[in-house]
Amino acid sequence: MPRNEIRPLVKLRSTAGTGYTYITRKNRRNDPDRLVLRKYDPVVRRHVDFREER
């Protein structure tokens, strides 16, 4: 199988509404739903939830 089918690149967008994004890889077999990670948003200078964007 090609590399991009199992672990595609996904964009994580800040829920604080700043437009700041992280890019990461996701394993579709282990995480079929949308990812939600708590990461640092430098625009608001605090940790917020980042949700997977499709």
UniProtKB/Swiss-Prot annotation:
UniProt superkingdom: Bacteria
Swiss-Prot/TrEMBL keywords: Ribonucleoprotein, Ribosomal protein
GO biological process: translation
Classification via Pfam families: Ribosomal_L33
GO cellular component, one term: cytosolic large ribosomal subunit
Keyword Ribosomal protein: yes
Entry keyword annotation includes Cell membrane: no
GO molecular function: structural constituent of ribosome
Family: Belongs to the bacterial ribosomal protein bL33 family.
Protein name according to UniProt: Large ribosomal subunit protein bL33B
Annotated source species: Mycobacterium avium (strain 104)
Origin organism lineage: Bacteria, Bacillati, Actinomycetota, Actinomycetes, Mycobacteriales
